[in-house]
Structures are given as structure tokens and as C-alpha cells.
């Protein structure tokens, strides 16, 4: 009797699933184990330390928020992701709501500016409508919105300077997230929102910092990155040549959150790949350090971190070998679209800082 009931329930379930697929299309509902692609594809951030902290990189088909103070590296990080996408043959779009995109700097970071789609909308509604249409097209692999704070509602732009419009931007973002979120998963497009910080007034306990645009983006984002400048890089009499950035993974739905990554950003050049390689190679014991001396395969290669980076830049074959050894030890073999594996997640879970 029990087996008959189970058989009847299975038939009823299969009939319901078939009806749902006829009504809403193939793939509208499925058993999780039957999914054709179980693992989330990712896009490199340009910083190997951050890729590791994210479990492979920025996830495709998701919303990502990057926020932090001014001049902390938000746009640089996003442009590196754009460059990685283009190098893999993907299509990239940049919604420049701040009207501040620098083509020369973008090109220096590896962005193909001739094929980069750029929009400079006049108001927030236009910007988010452009994003929605690009996502629906399923032909774009990555979209960067710079920034949420510059997505000013049309009513606020057309109104007087003294008019009050409480919560208008938050309502705009909430509606946009509802429209965009469903389409992103089907298109496989990565949408990156850059955001600014504001100070809450009268906060006694906890951080007074808050991101603009309300709470909708916080909930819909699969990954939230908090990027800060922790050090200014100086070299003798040459003065400042870059910054040391620290990124905290404040939220991550596809890998363990709350990890921390650090990397160098060189003015005019972007994220220092060699700096990330040296840091991780030392951590993985591919390169050893005794005092100020760095050694590889038992031979001293340079004295001091800057000289070690210079040595790798002058010896690209050795640098490529070290980079490959580091990626193999950390289960990050694919340079452009690394895929998180179960083994890699377990290995990475042992350490929180990179």
C-alpha cells in the first residue's frame, strides 16, 4: 500500500513538473542535482589575494557591490574585472553615472576601450533601464555601474534645489533590484555596483558609516566588498607611487565570507600582480624569506620586497612558474575564469587573511 502511494505521488510530481515546464519554459524548475552547471563561474579581480578570499573571483550571474571611501580603489578593482572579462572574449559595459571614466587609465589597466560599451545617462532611471536592457539581451558578460550615489532620480533633477525628496533614491534602487535580479541569473551577466559611504548622525554604538541608495542593494548583492586604503606607498626621494588596499568580504553567498585580502595599487598601472604573487608565494612557501632576502629553489633572488617584485618583472618565465605553483597550491589554476571547487573551499577555509 505504501509503495503504491509513493508511486502515485511520484507520478503526480512528474506531471506537475512537466506542466510547469510547458507553461514557463524548460529549466523553470529542476532538481538541484540535475542542474547542468553546479559550480559558479567567476571572473578574476586582478588581485590573486582577493580571488582567493572570494573563493575564485567575482561570481557570474550575480550582483556585486564594492563600497569604500574616496580614492580607495573601487573603480580600479572594477576595471580590472572588465579587463579580465574582455581578455576571455566577453563583452563589457560601463555605466558612467559620475561622468568620470578615464579612458587613458582604463587602457593602462588592460581594458579594450575600443570595444567597451559606455553609457553616461542623465538620471538614475535611465541608467538602471540601460542596465536592465543590457542584462535582458544576454549578450553582455559584465556591467559596471559607477556609482549608486550618482543615480539621481529624475524628479530630483527636474525639481528645485531646495525641494526635499526623502527616500526617492532608495525606492528607485528597490524597484530596479526587483526587475534586474531575476534576469541576471538567466543571462549569466555579472553586475557590479560601486557605492560611496556616508556618515549617520547621532550614532553612539557601532559604525556610523552607511552606503547610499537604501538597503535593497545589500540584500540582492551576492557579494559585498569593503575596500579601504591602509597605507601610502613611498619610495625614497621619488615620493608616493601607490597605495596598499585592504578588502574585507563583508558578504558572500557563494563562498565563506568575512575573509580579508590586501594588495598594492600602483598609480597609473593598477593592481600590482607581482606584489600579490610574492605575498602568496611566501605564504605558500614557494618563495622563502630570511631576513630581507627572498629565495626561490634555494637561491637568493633579491633583497627586499620591491627588489623581489622587480626581479620577477625582469624574469617573466620565472614569474609565470611561481604564479602557476601558487595557483596549484591554492586550487586557482584558471587565470581568467577560475571555478571554485569543494576541495579548494576546504583548503581556503583554514585561513581568513591573505
UniProtKB/Swiss-Prot annotation:
Matches recorded under Gene3D superfamilies: P-loop containing nucleotide triphosphate hydrolases
Protein localization: Cytoplasm
Keyword Chaperone attached: no
UniProt keyword ATP-binding, yes or no: yes
Record-stated family: Belongs to the RecA family.
PANTHER family, alphabetized: MITOCHONDRIAL DNA REPAIR PROTEIN RECA HOMOLOG-RELATED, RECA
Function statement: Can catalyze the hydrolysis of ATP in the presence of single-stranded DNA, the ATP-dependent uptake of single-stranded DNA by duplex DNA, and the ATP-dependent hybridization of homologous single-stranded DNAs. It interacts with LexA causing its activation and leading to its autocatalytic cleavage.
This protein's name: Protein RecA
Species classification: Bacteria, Bacillati, Cyanobacteriota, Cyanophyceae, Synechococcales
Amino acid at each position: 500500500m505504501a509503495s503504491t502511494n509513493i508511486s502515485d505521488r511520484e507520478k503526480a510530481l512528474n506531471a506537475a513538473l512537466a506542466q510547469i515546464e510547458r507553461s514557463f519554459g524548460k529549466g523553470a524548475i529542476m532538481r538541484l542535482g540535475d542542474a547542468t552547471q553546479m559550480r559558479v563561474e567567476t571572473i578574476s579581480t586582478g588581485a590573486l589575494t582577493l580571488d582567493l578570499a572570494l573563493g575564485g573571483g567575482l561570481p557570474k550571474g550575480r550582483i556585486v557591490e564594492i563600497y569604500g571611501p574616496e580614492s580607495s580603489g573601487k573603480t580600479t578593482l572594477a576595471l580590472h574585472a572588465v579587463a579580465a572579462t574582455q581578455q576571455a572574449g566577453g563583452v563589457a559595459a560601463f555605466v558612467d553615472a559620475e561622468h568620470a571614466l578615464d579612458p587613458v587609465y582604463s587602457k593602462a589597466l588592460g581594458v579594450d576601450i575600443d570595444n567597451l560599451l559606455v553609457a553616461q545617462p542623465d538620471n538614475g532611471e535611465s541608467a538602471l533601464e540601460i542596465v536592465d536592457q543590457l542584462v535582458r539581451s544576454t549578450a553582455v558578460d559584465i556591467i559596471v555601474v559607477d556609482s549608486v550615489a550618482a543615480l539621481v532620480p529624475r524628479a530630483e533633477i527636474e525639481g528645485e534645489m531646495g525641494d526635499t525628496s526623502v527616500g526617492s533614491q532608495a525606492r528607485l534602487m528597490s524597484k530596479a533590484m526587483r526587475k534586474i535580479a531575476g534576469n541576471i541569473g538567466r543571462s549569466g551577466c555579472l553586475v557590479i555596483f560601486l557605492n560611496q559611504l556616508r556618515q549617520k548622525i547621532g550614532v553612539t554604538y557601532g559604525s556610523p558609516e552607511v552606503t547610499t541608495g537604501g538597503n535593497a542593494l545589500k540584500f540582492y548583492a551576492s557579494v559585498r566588498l569593503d575596500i579601504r586604503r591602509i597605507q601610502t606607498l613611498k619610495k625614497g626621494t621619488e615620493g608616493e607611487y601607490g597605495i596598499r588596499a585592504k578588502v574585507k568580504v563583508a558578504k558572500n553567498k557563494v563562498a565563506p565570507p568575512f575573509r580579508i585580502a590586501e594588495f598594492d595599487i600602483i598609480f597609473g598601472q593598477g593592481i600590482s600582480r607581482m606584489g600579490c604573487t610574492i605575498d602568496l608565494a611566501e605564504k605558500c612557501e614557494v618563495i622563502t624569506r630570511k631576513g630581507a632576502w627572498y629565495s626561490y629553489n634555494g637561491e637568493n633572488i633579491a633583497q627586499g620586497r620591491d627588489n623581489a617584485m622587480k626581479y620577477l618583472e625582469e624574469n617573466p618565465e620565472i614569474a609565470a612558474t611561481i604564479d602557476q605553483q601558487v595557483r596549484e597550491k591554492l586550487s586557482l589554476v584558471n587565470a581568467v575564469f577560475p571555478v571554485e571547487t569543494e576541495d579548494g573551499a576546504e583548503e581556503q577555509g583554514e585561513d581568513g587573511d591573505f
